[in-house]
Amino acid sequence: MRCPFCGNDDTQVKDSRPTEDNSAIRRRRFCPACGARFTTFERVQLRELTVVKSGGSREPFDREKLLRSMRIALRKRPVDADRIDRVVNSIVRQLESSGETEIPSSQIGEMVMVHLGTLDKVAYVRYASVYKDFREVTDFNQFVETLRTDAPAG
């Protein structure tokens, strides 16, 4: 594995262990050339997935992009990184086991919305504001109002 700091191709694995949910192997690596230490993750990829954008363009599925979008929505919210990672792993497993190789971006967005809806309502609204392309304050008001009316009485 190439060192991300100096580019040396000869790095050493110092420690390997499964992640908490056993979905990946976490490896601590050391670069003898520059002395840097870094972590890599090895994950099973069941199939190559392609995301079909709303305009018809296609791009390879990027787990890190999905993770970044969820982290942005959950920024400064009381949800730990491991929980976010488990949700992303769950979404990826669902996509890979669907049998489809081309996945509409709207399907991924809906899956994220479902998970965020149960995880954190503020993050849910944040994500929805981008996913549903809110343009005015009234768009937020209408969306939040639907959350209130759809919520069970308590």
From Swiss-Prot:
Ranges of biased composition (kind: Basic and acidic residues): 11-22
Record key words, sorted: ATP-binding, DNA-binding, Metal-binding, Nucleotide-binding, Repressor, Transcription, Transcription regulation, Zinc, Zinc-finger
An example Gene Ontology biological process: negative regulation of DNA-templated transcription
Residue intervals of every unnamed zinc finger in the record: 3-34
Co-factor note (free text): Binds 1 zinc ion.
InterPro entries the record matches: ATP-cone_dom, NrdR-like_N, RNR_NrdR-like
Domain ATP-cone, first and last residues per copy: 49-139
Disordered, as annotated region: 1-22
Transcription listed as a keyword: yes
Entry-linked PROSITE patterns: ATP_CONE
Cofactors demanded by this protein: Zn(2+)
Gene Ontology terms for molecular function: ATP binding; DNA binding; zinc ion binding
Function: Negatively regulates transcription of bacterial ribonucleotide reductase nrd genes and operons by binding to NrdR-boxes.
Similarity-based family: Belongs to the NrdR family.
Protein name: Transcriptional repressor NrdR
Species the sequence originates in: Rhodospirillum centenum (strain ATCC 51521 / SW)
Underlying gene: nrdR
